[in-house]
Amino acid sequence: SDVYELCPTAAYRKMHPMYQAFAGITATQIHRFKESRKYCGCCGHLMENSKTERALVCPECGQTEYPKISPAVIVAISDGDRLLMSRYRVNNNPYRGYALIAGFVEIGESFEETIHREVMEEVGLKVKNIRYYKSQPWAFSDTEMIGFFAELDGPDKIKLQEDELSEAGWYHRDEIPDETMMNSIGSELKMVFKYGSLEKFYEVTGYKDQN
């Protein structure tokens, strides 16, 4: 007979094939949305599922609530053959690998302005030549991640935001570890910088795309 067990949602990060993991984590995002919007914020009436779209509707006053989706940027900052990578503080993020600078977009900000602000806040650096890469839904934090490349603009001395990061540094292409799980836009950005393209990464490492 089948055996089932309760697992943290982080287990989706290591699940294959990736389309099943995506379906599972998207379902948890929808569940989280519905659990947090049971009652209308305007009149207090019990909400109902919309019959026409992915939303909750109040049958009393007509208030409509949509799933929370917060835009955030993630940026691979380079200085020649070096890439800036960091590690999160344990209490702030369960991910223990090398990370790129990332953060949520604030009200009134463009994506580019968010990049400049987040980079200055977290590592005290300036960047230029910001270039869009691609986007990815990231249901773990109700986020739409927008990926970019950027180049260092000025001195490379890092001023660490210690309440967010435990460390940050510049790493030559040859020092960047190969990714073993290509399920995030951050992994793609690092491998595109290291190898020049995802295709080259797959060719050199023999990594099998498990989408």
Task: List where the protein language model places each region.
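Nudix hydrolase/Nudix homology domain
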Residues: 1-37, 93-97, 162-211
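Residue-level preference for alpha-helix termini and adjacent loops
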Residues: 32, 38, 46, 64-65, ...
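Unchanged
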Residues: 1-13, 103-189
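N-terminal strand-loop-strand
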Residues: 55-99, 104, 126-127, 131, ...
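Generic detector of short, locally flexible boundary/turn motifs and exposed helical patches
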Residues: 4-7, 21-25, 38-43, 48-52, ...
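A broadly tuned preference for mixed-charge, low-complexity surface segments
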Residues: 42-45, 93-101, 124-141, 199-204
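Cys/His-rich short segments
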Residues: 26-78
